[in-house]
Amino acid sequence: RAYQDGDDTLARRRQIVVDYLDTVPLAARPGMGEVHGLGDGLWAWYGRDFREVNRLLADNAEGAAAPTPEALQRQAEAFKQVLSLMIAQRRPSQHLLGDGTGLARLTDSYLRLMAEAGLIAPSLRDAALPLPLHLRPELPSTPRPDFVQRKATVALRTHISALLDVPRAYDLERLDLEAETSLDGEAQALASRLLAGLRTPAAAKAAGLFGPHMLDPGADPGPLIYSFTLFERGPQANLLRVQADNIDQPFDVNQGARLDLGSTAKLRTLVSYLELVAELHASWAGLSPAQLSALPNNPRDPLGAWARQYLLRAKDRRLAPMLEAAMERKYSANPGESFFTGGGLHQFENFERSRNSESMTVREGFKHSINLVFIRLMRDVVRHRMFGGASDAESLLKDPADPRRREMLERFADREGSAYLIRFYRKYQRQSAAGAEALLLRGLKPSAPRLASVLFTIEPEASEERLDELLTQRLGKGFAGSPRALRALRTTYAGLSLADRGYVARVHPLELWLVGYLRRHPGATLSEVLDASASERQEVYAWLFKTRHKSAQDKRLRELVELDAFAEVHRSWQRLGYPFESLTPSYASAIGASGDRPAALAELMGIIAGDGVRRPVQRVDALHFARDTPYETRLEPRDAGAEQVLPTEVAATVRRALVQVVQDGTARRLKGALVDANGRAIEIGGKTGTGDHRYGHNGRGGGAGAERKISRSATFVFTIGDRYFGTIMAYVNEPYAARYRFTSALPTQLLKSLGPQLLPVLERGGCGGD
């Protein structure tokens, strides 16, 4: 490129020098960032204006008129400062971040050398040498706003990092980038300030947070965490307007944790139920009565049986009336039944015990958040996935010769064996060989057969002398094993299968295998253990594959069929924004056992409020790079495309149920709480949920043992009018959780307090325009 204009490259070489001077790195300063180029360097380190310095140096150029003594002093100071920066670029941090004495000494030395070489006039040298180099003092540090005030900013920066695939904050900071966001700045600041203030009793009292099912009189509101997320439905995307919490840490409780949000899971369960009804309608609504009657009738699928009977009787076969009829199906609220689910027997309770004897519709159960109604509803959903539609699980369970049984039993053995190995690995992973052996034998009632079974599993090549040593150590000196007896023990127990050695030792055979494997492969990872144990996991369940154990097989096959049914439920939840890669395979998922995130619940509410359409969440309206430069670029979001993920009729049915929760259900304190500019009540819908996360275990004899309260949460996921939706949550973690008994009354009251303050700000800020 230097020769594009001919052989004379002087101009190009000068430009290269200018480009270098404009980009030379000159360390960094707090409050300013990295310093590049002489212009920024003069301002950052000496407080000088670049144009003024250039003018002074031009006035001193060769051929210029002789300066006055005052002008010479100014020119000398400017020249010395520029020269010092050119020297400092060798080691900018060393020269510019220290006390400056070394830099001054080097600069004076170069002034003398340049004068001797005739590069500068002696008068300029003599004027510059006495002048001190005063590096500009650091700017007074401005107090950084706390994390509460910067929460949305931090979340947006993280989002932008992901959009640009720039994972390091350091690299993001180096971009000349402005981001235009969908956040309403005034509403965001107001919400952050209000939530932060709730840590004081006075502010909590002013918001009405003390009272039944909220904060007890005298309770300390300080440990409570509040979060609030508000979206607005736009034409192409759901726009984030407010994202705030009062955690003074970078952690974002709206998106960063898996929380027990209690009965908000009933919303997901209701949607799954109505989706199934819509699927059955799509399959059967066009059939004649004779065709409907000819459909197979499985007594294990009550939902399919109801749908068939409804369509046989219905005069109006449209989907909307069928969904309304599905909301009127009745379930018992009786907690007396035990439910076999998730591989175990479970019992559940209602929050309102006065409802225990009632039988109520799905609509009433949702409105009043009755646990047992939704446990039974989830059971019907799962059973339909197990035995209804195209499922052939019934024949699998009935026919012992079905070849699929063997395949599924092998899958069960692999799954359950892996679960045991994971547990055993955690127990032994940090133990030495001797420590693992001692831990294994600690709970073992010693006998010669048991000890021999253990030894020849963990140490297959053990000698009879080693066996004698172990028996003497564990059985005492009274044991005197003859060589013949030791040989007999070795012959008998070393030759047993892994499962039989575990049976003799009264230790799970995979635990024995793991201790032996870790002895031979110290430091093995869990992944290596699982890879190495594939055949052993099948071997220890060999008894299960024998046809005489059909009842045991059926029990485990039902567990797997249920697991597959929950996998289908999980896929439907994920399609509607459920954020996790697994779902707890238990009816308890209907009341919150599987966890959720406030942001994910808000997305589900956006789908419901948007007539079943899933719109992308938009946090950033535009990214503007290098403004007012030749490289200026502006990027705006592409239309990601909305997707119809729920039938419109399903969304409308759920929306009506949500409104009834506020009109006459668990969130009725919000009825009429918000009004528009004309004084008309704004319609609010939502679902409440209270999560009480505890850890406990049974005591001796199956009685209640120790219990630890891990956390408590109360959540309200809501819609406001036709445009706004979101979540509001109160949360407290251990060690404070045991002090509080609040329910979802707390966040609903908080929304009642916040809403009238926030909505006018949002409307004034122009939110809501299409």
Predicted regions and their residues:
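A generic secondary-structure signal for well-formed alpha-helical elements
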Residues: 24, 28, 49, 93, ...
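Non-catalytic, structured segments within soluble enzyme domains
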Residues: 1-196, 230, 378-380, 385-531, ...
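Acidic helix-start/capping segments at beta-turn-to-alpha-helix junctions
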Residues: 1, 38-41, 125-147, 177, ...
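Acidic/histidine-enriched alpha-helical segments
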Residues: 34-43, 59, 103-105, 116-135, ...
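Flexible glycine/proline-enriched surface loops and loop-helix/loop-strand junctions
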Residues: 1-3, 63-69, 90-96, 172-177, ...
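Active-site-adjacent bridging/hinge elements
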Residues: 53-54, 160-171, 235-250, 340-341, ...
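A penicillin-recognizing enzyme superfamily signal
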Residues: 181-230, 238-255, 269, 313-327, ...
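Short, glycine/proline-biased beta-turn/loop segments that scaffold the active-site neighborhood
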Residues: 261-358, 498-523, 615-633
